[in-house]
Amino acid sequence: MQLLNFGLLLLPFVAGDLAPQPEPLLAGPSDVVPGQYIVTLKEGLTSAQIRDHKKWVSSVHRANLDSFAAGASGVETEGIMKHFHIHDLNMYSGGFDEKTVEDLSRNPYVKSVHPDQHVYLAKTVTQRQARWGLGYMSSKGKPVPLHSTLVDYSYDDKAGEGVWAYVLDTGINVNHVEFEGRGILGHNAIPNKPHTDEFGHGTYVAGIIAGKTYGVAKKANVVSAKAFDTGSSTYNYILETYDWIVRNITDSNRKNKAVINLSISGAKYQPFDDAVEKAFKAGITTVVAAGNDGKDAKNNTPASSPNAITVGAVRWENTRPSFSNYGKLVDIWAPGELIKSCWKGGNNATSTQSGTSAASPHVAGLVAYLMSIENLPSPSAVTARVLNLTIPNLVKDAKDSPNRVAYNGIQERKFTLPKYY
């Protein structure tokens, strides 16, 4: 069994077409967490088989640690650490010596063993203020003035009410005035760290989804699911957080009233693509960023997950920013350059940023908005409705991507409520 060494990155903001700085698709050997792995089990195992397998792992790991060869590696390993169960997908993380990893790779119950990896936050770039993104979402793709503060954003007054948007990110400043008490601290996977947003990325993303001024779905609830902190994370924490989100949505009976946003990207990593796919089969919608590499998104995770809604970035005059990924797996295009939203540093703080990190929450907000006004019983129905509303053939330099820009459908409704922001 081949051991794969790929990673996942929280998407950086970029400086637009003036100075795009894409992250490398493949992380270097130094990013691997020594002795730590993600193990995916084969489908169809019974609870008893999984329980027996874990007992076997503990026994083999202990025996190997007791041997001189295992002890000579110099890597302290702790065995199975966390368990992940998403629909019928069973995975676990663990700290294992090399001999135990070899034994795991040969075990008939094991589908794959992937090294865990550090995931890094990149620096953000603050840019001049702009207010075009929301107006674009209700204009049927009509180019809008970049710096105008009088662009109409028209929407149904339900505006995401009764819907929950889960943001797997750096946390959310739930006390920011933009959230009006609709921000919820859900899960913090980072040990010994407060559930706050020290980097701004998660708060920014949440503001585009549900901020009273900057949000697409202005009455939706936003749930903070923190998997990143001081610039670094691992799949151990990302999978834990995604698992928690899926469980929380399921246990709260919110499947048709919840959406997950993932403004993260990295090289193709099958365990996480599998997790997103299993969430879809469980009845949960996930919206993901296409990535900021200026390349085909087919080599990125989670953009390549077949049933995620993958979002590329478009500029105000309907061109693709050079940083935005593209390709047949990009389902839809949404505003992603010079977008203003909430930020860290205070309950009124704002920042203007660029990247597919901004494009993805526009569509996650659109999903929340549509869930509040229409009966969309499944992720398939959600995806079909979002794509049915899109405006075709507007994006210049879309490469071989489906050429569809996001639209909220307001001009086809019987009533239109003009709003200003």
UniProtKB/Swiss-Prot annotation:
Domain Inhibitor I9: 36-122
Family annotation (Pfam families): Inhibitor_I9, Peptidase_S8
UniProt-listed Enzyme Commission number(s): 3.4.21.-
CC annotations in GO: extracellular region
Sequence ranges assigned to domain Peptidase S8 in this UniProt record: 131-421
InterPro entries: PCSK9_ProteinaseK-like, Peptidase_S8/S53_dom, Peptidase_S8/S53_dom_sf, Peptidase_S8_Asp-AS, Peptidase_S8_His-AS, Peptidase_S8_Ser-AS, Peptidase_S8_subtilisin-like, Peptidase_S8_subtilisin-rel
Induction comment: Expression is up-regulated during infection.
Entry keyword set: Glycoprotein, Hydrolase, Protease, Secreted, Serine protease, Signal, Virulence, Zymogen
Glycosylated residues in this chain: N248, N261, N348, N388
Residues in the signal sequence: 1-16
Root EC class: hydrolase
GO annotation (BP), single: proteolysis
Main location: secreted
SUPFAM superfamilies, A to Z: Subtilisin-like
Active site per UniProt: D169, H201, S357
A GO term, aspect molecular function: serine-type endopeptidase activity
Positions of the propeptide segment: 17-122
Cellular localization per UniProt: Secreted
Annotated family: Belongs to the peptidase S8 family.
Function: Secreted subtilisin-like serine protease with keratinolytic activity that contributes to pathogenicity.
UniProt name for this protein: Subtilisin-like protease 2
Species of origin: Arthroderma benhamiae (strain ATCC MYA-4681 / CBS 112371) (Trichophyton mentagrophytes)
GN (gene name): SUB2
